[in-house]
Amino acid sequence: MNLEEEMQVKWEEKKRELEEEVHIALVGQPGAGKSSLINKLIGRKLFETGVHTDTTVDMQEAAYGTLRIHDLPGYGTARFPVERWVEEFHPEQYDLYLFVFEGKLHDSDAILFTFLKQWRDEREHPFFIVRNKKDQIWDEEKPKDALMDEIAKDVRDKLDEPDAAVQFVSCRTSEGIEDLKQAIFAADVLGVKRSKLRAEFQATSMEDLAYKKQHSMKAVNTYAWLGAANAVNPVPGLDVTLDVGMFYKLLSEIRRIFGITDDLAQTLEKYKVLAPIGQRVFSYATQEGVVMMVKKLAGEFAGKEISKYIPFVGQAAAAATGYMMIQKIGEKYVDDCYTIAQEILRGILKR
């Protein structure tokens, strides 16, 4: 295999890693708050709440970054007994499952559990049993802990797993959401998918943000390599080749991962310390802004940075310069977004 072939193999490998998606299936009882739960975990309104999927026969889908969320319709009905439901929607293909319920479990739930265990054991696709609306668990004659123990025992009996974990959460109060997040992050999800889960879920701690920064730095390296290797046209007037569209996509992805949305631009202007950072971040929010920034900084990188590290000439040097530019500017962009996200989490910025 010659150098060109090796580069092509590497390019395809990095592209597959970049494009790999994580598929999450929402299953369980209608009205249990599946939509509210995934909205809470991600921190975005991906699904309308209060829509009961037992009255429909279609799957609802939403995308957020590399996450693909599949809200499956009800099962155990005359039209969709569990086995027929499995044949129709092929849920075995998804990476992980959130089984959400709020009332008593039914025989159809127990049948579904046998499939969930099969997919976990044979395909390494984990599932999580989530009892939503924890704040509404109440009985004047029994303490809440005793009621929760009874619910957990019922789940374990139907699942036939005495040590199975049951996650109790409340989307209204956020109670239990952090524990569920950590359980998902610790799940046996193979390869880069685990990293993407942590990157896309809403950050609720400084530890989450630190992980997002680490993930974003790796993404910068991947995009830098792809952006330089894939570039076929030089930036007009410069001795640099890079894929501007891919560079723009990288910066957009970094903002999304850190939860920095367009509506923050005006808010950031009110804070003296953060205003310059915000201006930098949002000045690169369009492809035109990216091109202007590349033109502004290309001379510095071509003249100083690249000569130290890359002994190339001609087109190879131009591509290598593009790589270094994406790498260095991308890392700085991550730092800026990380700083803003930290302040958001600390509550300094009020939306």
Predicted regions mapped to residue ranges:
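Conserved G1/Walker A P-loop phosphate-binding module
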Residues: 1-77, 260-261
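Switch II of P-loop NTPase G domains
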Residues: 54, 70-118
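Alpha-helical membrane association modules
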Residues: 199-351
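Short glycine-/polar-rich loops that comprise or flank the Walker A/P-loop
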Residues: 92-96, 122-127, 161-165
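Canonical P-loop GTPase G-domain recognition
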Residues: 133-199
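Flexible, charged surface loops at secondary-structure boundaries
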Residues: 18-19, 62-64, 89-95, 160
